[in-house]
Amino acid sequence: MGSIDNLTEKLASQFPMNTLEPEEFRRQGHMMIDFLADYYRKVENYPVRSQVSPGYLREILPESAPYNPESLETILQDVQTKIIPGITHWQSPNFFAYFPSSGSTAGFLGEMLSTGFNVVGFNWMVSPAATELENVVTDWFGKMLQLPKSFLFSGGGGGVLQGTTCEAILCTLVAARDKNLRQHGMDNIGKLVVYCSDQTHSALQKAAKIAGIDPKNFRAIETTKSSNFQLCPKRLESAILHDLQNGLIPLYLCATVGTTSSTTVDPLPALTEVAKKYDLWVHVDAAYAGSACICPEFRQYLDGVENADSFSLNAHKWFLTTLDCCCLWVRNPSALIKSLSTYPEFLKNNASETNKVVDYKDWQIMLSRRFRALKLWFVLRSYGVGQLREFIRGHVGMAKYFEGLVNMDKRFEVVAPRLFSMVCFRIKPSAMIGKNDEDEVNEINRKLLESVNDSGRIYVSHTVLGGIYVIRFAIGGTLTDINHVSAAWKVLQDHAGALLDDTFTSNKLVEVLS
């Protein structure tokens, strides 16, 4: 026994470090909360978009990791002086560039608890609460959205929390692929065709590449301004018939509720009718706008989802849940499981073999998974359906107000209908005296975008709709209020005025010289 005791003492002396001592964790945890609270108190004062140049951080950080420990105080000082200057502040109330990554006290605290527990909930046995809470909150959320019962666990379907929409689309596409190939034969993968619009998020194209779909069989159907950039059911059916005539196999349709470029909503009832006629898997991507559909006045945009096979939205976008949390519901979980399940010996257990539990490892690409359900549960309980609806309505109201400001200024025009909390607008051709060429109008709008973003006062982004360069003004930040919207519009007006004056002066000079 003596030799074992000596070995125990020796090993104990070799590992003196306790990296999770409760009282030190408490002390440092308070420091971190204080740091973040101070950050949020002054986040509005930072330039919204980072002003650094590529490679700035490598120039100011050491070439190798420290040999000796450093204090949290020292590390946080470096965060303040070295990291924050290189952050684009997504939580700034003046961030209007992309769909929000909305945060909240409840979301942060749920994330903290999830990270603190640090469980790896790949199946029911390794953390029953992680699995069962996810079952519950996805059913809760599904009921809030009035999803068909067939998408809920209580109706034979079910929900799963993925990291992002990219993962959700890939999982459903793989499930659709394998279901089809079991019917038509594995050697027909080169004949499978995926359909979407030219407004569909690029996540689908990436998923199709990963899933082995021939790039020649990816159909991004053209949309038009006259139809508000919706996917046209007649064009979809025409594309399907053309592919069938050429011996191809229509596989998968992705319809969108709230496109990234303009937030348009594809006509789900007509599209699903066409898709079901030809036995396509239908996925509805509502990454951004899906959250709004908990409000009765927006639920209409999900009409037709009852004919879809899967549906997803990002709670981390407009639902106060913090990145990452994508909710995916499927009508037939067995389709996912057949494609994504693995059951090596070291994962076998009695609970799984009863087939009475959900093993979420078989609903996703990865094996390991985080306890995401905690933060969604915290958000749902902390704010309730009523306050969550008002949060969304507040942003929609601000967008409506901004739209009114744009319409009152004769130099600008709204380019696409505003449905939710984003406005697509531009300096219109008539504001540019003697310059009605579309390329020149696009260029002045590009310069406006660069000018306001370089100022650091606000951050906006752009898209191109039907050849028109458009500025996107997306409202959704947790800290944004009507005063920030008004101030942002003043920034845009001032910069537009300066650019138009310069353009007018340049044109006059050209006239004189000619």
UniProtKB/Swiss-Prot annotation:
Pfam families recorded: Pyridoxal_deC
PTM-bearing positions, type N6-(pyridoxal phosphate)lysine: 317
Keyword Ribonucleoprotein: no
Recorded GO MF terms: 3,4-dihydroxyphenylacetaldehyde synthase activity; pyridoxal phosphate binding
Keywords, comma-separated and alphabetical: Decarboxylase, Lyase, Pyridoxal phosphate
Reaction catalysed by this enzyme: L-tyrosine + O2 + H2O + H(+) = (4-hydroxyphenyl)acetaldehyde + H2O2 + NH4(+) + CO2; L-dopa + O2 + H2O + H(+) = 3,4-dihydroxyphenylacetaldehyde + H2O2 + NH4(+) + CO2
Cofactor section: pyridoxal 5'-phosphate
Keyword Lyase (UniProt): yes
Cellular-component GO terms for this entry: cytoplasm
UniProt enzyme class: lyase
Induction cue: Induced by fungal elicitor. Induced by methyl jasmonate.
Residues forming coiled coils: none
InterPro entries, per database record: Aromatic_deC, PyrdxlP-dep_de-COase, PyrdxlP-dep_Trfase, PyrdxlP-dep_Trfase_major, PyrdxlP-dep_Trfase_small, Pyridoxal-P_BS
Record EC number: 4.1.1.108, 4.1.1.107
Stored SUPFAM superfamilies: PLP-dependent transferases
Uses described in the biotechnology field: TYDC-2 from parsley can be used in E.coli to produce 3,4-dihydroxyphenylacetaldehyde, a direct precursor of hydroxytyrosol, which is a natural compound from olive oil with a strong antioxidant activity.
GO BP terms: amino acid metabolic process; carboxylic acid metabolic process
Family to which this protein belongs: Belongs to the group II decarboxylase family.
Function per UniProt: Catalyzes the production of 4-hydroxyphenylacetaldehyde (HPAA) directly from L-tyrosine, tyramine not being formed as an intermediate. Catalyzes both the decarboxylation and deamination of L-dopa to 3,4-dihydroxylphenylacetaldehyde (DHPAA).
Subunit relationships: Homodimer.
Protein name: 4-hydroxyphenylacetaldehyde synthase
